[in-house]
Regions:
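N-terminal alpha/beta PP-like core and its mobile active-site loop of ThDP/TPP-dependent enzymes
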Residues: 1-331, 371-374, 454-459, 474-477, ...
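Phosphate/pyrophosphate-binding active-site segments
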Residues: 136, 172, 197, 293-384, ...
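A short acidic, glycine-rich active-site loop
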Residues: 46, 181-185, 404-407, 477-486, ...
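Active-site diphosphate/adenylate-binding microenvironment
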Residues: 6-10, 14-19, 27, 32-37, ...
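Catalytic phosphate/nucleotide-handling subdomain of diverse soluble enzymes
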Residues: 412, 416-454, 460
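Active-site nucleophile and cofactor-binding loops and adjacent substrate-binding regions
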Residues: 24-26, 45-56, 71-78, 133-134, ...
Length: 562
């Protein structure tokens, strides 16, 4: 049958099972929005307050559901406003399809009104992108975009469509999408055998889990693997929830703000088994001193990650779930009682601690965990609150912790929380924000209110850019340049003006009461939590130092006294 390009866009989305699109209309994309209007019962459109909010919402939807997130934007500034969200998704391997519309084909390259080379701009931050200048190729291009976004290591794909292509007609035939196949043809049985041999030979193995394990859906296989290897397990920020954070074998996060147990344990192990990690600088610290006593065995779907940031001794390339299935089949149960005993001693010696009186970031995370029984979807912005959320909330399941890890995008959380809440209507979604981050995209409170989303926005408000100030305090001789936010902005009134409920709390009891009411609310709730401006994230590894040298505030005080 003959359809316009705009009709083809909508039909292709329906083919792919898309039920929600986040976006903002404009002149170039009007034909697509006009067609979307006719399919309101099949595809929900969420009008965000800003295109960046739409891209973050698509990201949060994708991370929390495992499905592709979709966002729309018009030409020019509409498209460029997506860029930060696309880059965020790219750095964290999130399957997002961004559909933009441009000026008509005859106007391309002529500096036309709202013309922008969005394909060129996003080339370094997309897994692939397309500009469609022939309507006969539109349907297959959109189908390819969805396949590329999900296959192997996921990532964002952009499809840019000139406006005249959305009006042009061509023949369209519906196609049933094929299931996305797991990457198994790259798994070499010889490599699997080598991995099994290394594990059997190890006396002090340690399992290090990243976001790849979440993406692959390998949690059950990972649990079996950890039990068979009889090894402690640490994770990255992106790996939260892949392995049960309440399990006795779990030792917490590794790296700059990792636990002392994980940092010391990895520094002492003789085999580090990396499952879906990219060995970022935030984890490695001084790369030359990282896991210096260990052989490193890496499992990853992306061959480009092998030996990229650190040299490994062996690797298995392919889908992590399938790799773990094959290794588990060939691996007998191992036993390392002395090693496990050493790790348990470290856990007892170096627990995460904080002052129990007063309102603080760690207290808020522990109380949120207690009140939600660990069953919420936690979203964060970027900064101190992000680290506290990673440290003190125990994640039992994958896709329950959403955060911008690779790019570190302030302003990510609220949009992502909207996407997560829409993708998971039966779950409680909570965005943890700093007062600096909240200012970035606080306009999306209006979106949450309009959509009647019962998400909770918890602002950890210290009236400073906390993480930047922490570095200024520790490494810049307390020169607090441009990090004080003492302008008296009333976040509660802002929330109420946008249709949400707002509370300001200054004590533990006030927070408990406000959070209890928030959990019972059917509309978004903002809780502005006033904490000490001088609170810091501990432990910490100084830049350029080995992760084994992580220190706390107490360590620093003792050093200064000596």
């Amino acid at each position: 049958m003959q359809l316009t390009g705009a009709q083809i866009v909508i039909e292709c989305l329906k083919e792919q099972g898309v039920d929600t699109v986040f976006g903002y209309p404009g002149g170039a994309i009007l034909n697509v929005y006009d067609e979307l209007y006719k399919h309101q019962g099949e595809i929900r459109h969420v009008l965000t307050s800003h295109e960046q909010g739409a891209s973050h919402a698509a990201d949060g939807y994708a991370r929390s559901t495992g499905k592709v997130g979709v966002c729309f934007a018009t030409s020019g500034p509409g498209a460029t406003n997506l860029v930060t969200g696309i880059a965020t998704a790219y750095m964290d391997s999130v399957p997002v399809v961004a559909i933009t519309c441009n000026v008509t084909v005859p106007l391309l390259g002529k500096d036309s009104f709202q013309e922008i080379d969005i394909a060129g701009i996003t080339m370094p931050i997309t897994k692939h992108n397309f500009i469609v200048k022939d309507v006969t190729k539109l349907a297959d291009t959109i189908r390819r975009a969805f396949k590329i976004a999900q296959t192997g290591r996921p990532g964002p794909v952009l499809v840019d469509i000139p406006k005249d292509i959305t009006a042009a007609k061509t023949e369209y035939t519906s196609v049933e999408p094929k299931p996305i196949a797991r990457v198994t043809d790259t798994i070499c049985e010889k490599d699997v055998d080598t991995a099994v041999s290394m594990i059997k030979a190890a006396k002090k193995p340690y399992i290090f889990v990243g976001g790849g394990a979440v993406i692959s859906g390998a949690s059950e296989e990972l649990k079996e693997f950890a039990g068979k290897v009889n090894a402690p397990v640490c994770d990255t920020l992106m790996g939260k929830g892949a392995f049960d954070g309440t399990d006795d074998l779990y030792t917490g996060m590794l790296g700059m703000h990792g636990t002392k147990t994980s940092n010391l344990g990895v520094s002492e192990c003789d085999l580090l088994i990396a499952v879906g990690v990219r060995f970022s600088d935030r984890v490695l610290g001084n790369a030359k001193k990282f896991a210096s006593q260990a052989k490193i065995l890496q499992f990853d779907v992306d061959a480009a990650e092998i030996n990229k940031n650190i040299q490994v001794d062996a690797s298995v390339i392919g889908d992590l779930k399938e790799i773990l299935i094959r290794v588990n089949e060939k691996l007998d149960a191992q036993s390392h009682p002395e090693w496990i005993g050493e790790i348990m001693d470290l856990k007892k010696k170096y627990p995460l601690t904080y002052p129990k009186e007063g309102l603080s970031g760690p207290y808020l995370m522990e109380e949120i965990y207690r009140a939600t029984k660990g069953d919420a979807v936690i979203v964060t912005e970027v900064g101190q609150h992000q680290m506290w959320a990673a440290q003190y909330y125990k994640y039992k399941n994958p896709r329950t912790f959403l955060s911008s890890g690779g790019l570190g995008t302030m302003g990510y959380g609220l949009g992502a929380a909207i996407g997560a809440q829409i993708g998971n209507p039966d779950k409680q979604v909570i965005n943890i924000a700093g007062d600096g981050c909240f200012r970035m995209n606080m306009n999306e409170i209006a979106t949450a209110a309009r959509e009647k989303l019962p998400l909770i926005e918890v602002i950890v408000n210290n009236h400073v850019l906390g993480m930047v100030r922490q570095w200024q305090d520790l490494f810049y001789e307390k020169r607090y340049s441009a990090t004080v936010l003492d302008d008296g902005v009333d976040f509660v009134k802002l929330a109420e003006a946008m249709g949400a409920k707002g509370y300001r709390v200054t004590s533990q009891e006030e927070f408990k009461e406000a959070f209890k009411e928030a959990l019972e609310s059917e509309v978004p709730v903002l809780i502005d939590c006033i904490i000490n401006f001088d609170d810091k994230v501990w432990p910490m590894v100084a830049p350029g130092e080995a992760i084994s040298s992580s220190f706390t505030g107490e360590d620093l005080a003792k050093k200064q006294q000596s």
